[in-house]
Amino acid sequence: MNITIVAPYCSLPSEPHFNRFWYLAELLSQSHDVLLITSNFKHYDKSFRRPEDAEAASQGRLKVMLLEESGYSKNVSLGRVTSHHRFVKHFEQWLENCRPGEQDVVFSAYPLIATNLLLGKHKARLGYKLIVDVQDVWPESFSSVVPFLKKVPHNLLPFASRANQAYRYADALVAVSQTYLDRAKEANPNVPGEVVYIGADFPKLDAAPAKDFGD
């Protein structure tokens, strides 16, 4: 089976942060051909990856592809909007060049909203099943930056209709919490859904040396 994972915020093995998308990519590549698509920009430290980083992370049946974005210095900024737009444009170009049958399943992180909308629009042409993994609820989470949005019903928020359409394109839904899954299922109630909480790598925890913090 050919599986594509779309995860703009994914960390690679040489980087300090662990996440489910790399874990899933490694696990699936044991028996499937896996393409992991992520950004050349590292959200956590605001630096850029090099093409060699993708080459080093690719192994066996797992291939890593970096899409270019312009980067940003602040998480809440016009620069981030511009950077995401650039990533989405490159993703759209890649998707338009794909041929039917190249992917059997696409597992896509949400957000971004736009990448999931594109995947939904191309799904029938390319013939894959789309699984959307809800990591955060946009636009609802914008209320942490603009508090008055908490008073607005979520379906009246800016971009709510785009969010609902992204959820509706999914053939199955995964989310990091029951609350997030419920939100996605509100828009797309008739597909399978599963909560998979953010976890930890227990072997690494067990191998870590104990530290005495005193009294």
Language-model region placement:
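A conserved catalytic-core segment of Leloir-type glycosyltransferases
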Residues: 36-98, 196
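A short, histidine- and acid-enriched strand-loop-helix "catalytic/donor-clamping" loop
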Residues: 10-13, 100, 114, 128-150, ...
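Acidic anion/phosphate-binding donor-loop and adjacent secondary structure
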Residues: 200-215
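Carbohydrate-associated surface elements
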Residues: 40, 179, 199
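N-terminal subdomain of nucleotide-sugar transferases
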Residues: 1-59, 172
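Phosphate- and divalent-cation-binding pockets in alpha/beta enzyme and binding domains
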Residues: 114, 118, 182-186, 204
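Membrane-proximal helix-turn-helix segments that form the acceptor-binding/catalytic region
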Residues: 114-117, 121-125, 138-140, 153-173
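An aromatic- and histidine-rich active-site surface loop
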Residues: 14, 80-96, 105-126, 132-141
